[in-house]
């Protein structure tokens, strides 16, 4: 009887030992699984934050471009590309200007005013040519305005070079107002459709990248939950 009881106790001890080993293995697997899930969740959270940050940055860039470049592009009336022929180019007078010489320091100077009159080939009108849209805003009497500086002779030399270039190339493309409200044309558009496209391209790529990151993380989470449900059903 003693021998039988001892054998039974030894057998029970072995079974308990096996159960403890299996339990330890199972606990170890569960711990590894929890660590993996925690690491994946942390990585997913970082990816979502990155995607949201990219979308917020792109929205801010859209806003800044909208109040600067896009508004100027929409307000520009010189939208029709045309051909201009030079009629007259001359330096008419000088205007006063001011330039910065340091923090809280401004000095007065002068710049020569270059006037260029052209013939618009499509209508035959005699119109004043401006370098860009901003030239008209600075001084409506001048076609080209050099940068205001301390050296007037340098500004005069630059304007003379521009004048000689016009005399050398008397036929050139320009931009006019198709509705005819502006009795002037411009030589170069600061806010063309090409400039607008390149300015909006990178914010759009950033927005698309942010949306793609968030969508991929959400899709991964959905597929993970779906696989877990399928495993539970199969059990």
Swiss-Prot record:
Protein family: Belongs to the KCNMB (TC 8.A.14.1) family. KCNMB2 subfamily.
Gene name for this UniProt entry: Kcnmb2
Record GO terms (molecular function): calcium-activated potassium channel activity
GO CC term, one of those recorded: voltage-gated potassium channel complex
The organism of origin for this protein: Mus musculus (Mouse)
Name by which UniProt lists this protein: Calcium-activated potassium channel subunit beta-2
Pfam families: CaKB, KcnmB2_inactiv
Assembly description: Interacts with KCNMA1 tetramer. There are probably 4 molecules of KCMNB2 per KCNMA1 tetramer.
Residues bearing carbohydrate: 88, 96, 119
């Amino acid at each position: 009887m003693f021998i039988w009881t001892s054998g039974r106790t030894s057998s029970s001890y072995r079974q308990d030992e096996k159960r403890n080993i299996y339990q330890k293995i199972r606990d170890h697997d569960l711990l590894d699984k929890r660590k993996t899930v925690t690491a994946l969740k942390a990585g997913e959270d970082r990816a979502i934050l990155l995607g949201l940050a990219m979308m917020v940055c792109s929205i801010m860039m859209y806003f800044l471009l909208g109040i600067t470049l896009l508004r100027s592009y929409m307000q520009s009336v010189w939208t029709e590309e045309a051909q201009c022929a030079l009629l007259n180019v001359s330096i008419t007078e000088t205007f006063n200007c001011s330039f910065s010489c340091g923090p809280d320091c401004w000095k007065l100077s002068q710049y020569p005013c270059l006037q260029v009159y052209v013939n618009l080939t499509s209508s035959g009108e005699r119109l004043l040519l401006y370098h860009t849209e901003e030239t008209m805003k600075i001084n409506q009497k001048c076609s080209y305005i050099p940068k205001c500086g301390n050296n007037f002779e340098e500004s005069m030399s630059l304007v003379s070079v521009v004048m000689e270039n016009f005399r050398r190339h008397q036929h050139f493309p320009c931009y006019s107002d198709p509705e005819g409200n502006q009795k002037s044309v411009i030589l170069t558009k600061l806010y063309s459709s090409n400039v607008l496209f390149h300015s909006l391209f990178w914010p759009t790529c950033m927005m698309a990248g942010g949306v793609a990151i968030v969508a991929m993380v959400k899709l991964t989470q959905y597929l993970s939950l779906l696989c877990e449900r399928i495993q539970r059903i199969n059990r």
